[in-house]
Amino acid sequence: MTLYSTLYDRALAQITDPLLAQLPEEDLEYMLHDWLMDAIVEPVVGEYDFSDRNEELKQFNFDISERDQKILSIHMVRAWLAPQIRSVTLTNQVFSGKESKFYAQANQLAEMRALDEQLRKDADLLFCRGTYLNNGYFD
C-alpha cells in the first residue's frame, strides 16, 4: 500500500512556497489531492492501475516503487506550477504599460515555463531509465 501522504510529502519537499505553509491543513490536503489526481493520469508513470485506491484511507491498494513515487511527485509539482504559469494576473502584468514591469514579469513567466519544461524532462528521463533497466533485454 502506498499512502497519499507519502506522495504529498515527496511533492512538498520539492516546493518552496511560504503561502502553502500558511494554508489550513484541510485546504492544503485538498490541493495536494488534486495535484496527485492530475499526476496519476500522466502516461509516463509505471504499469499501475491507479483506479485501485481507497479514498477513505487515502491510499493506493498497491506499492508504488520509489522511482515511480519520484516521477509522480515531479508531476504533482508540475500541477502546482501550471496555474501560476497560466495566471491571468501574471499575464496582465506582463502586458502592462511599464517596460520595466513588462521585462520583470516576462522573465518570471519565462523562468516558470522553463522550470515546467525541465520538470517534464526529469520525469520523462526517470521513466525511460526505468524502462531500459526493467525491459529484460539485457538479461
Each predicted region: which residue ranges?
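Conserved short "hinge" loops at termini or chain/domain junctions
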Residues: M1-D63, L125-D139
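Amphipathic alpha-helical interaction segments
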Residues: T16, P43, V88, Y103, ...
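Divalent metal-cofactor coordination and adjacent catalytic microenvironments
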Residues: Y30-S100, A106
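Amphipathic alpha-helical binding modules
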Residues: E99-T131
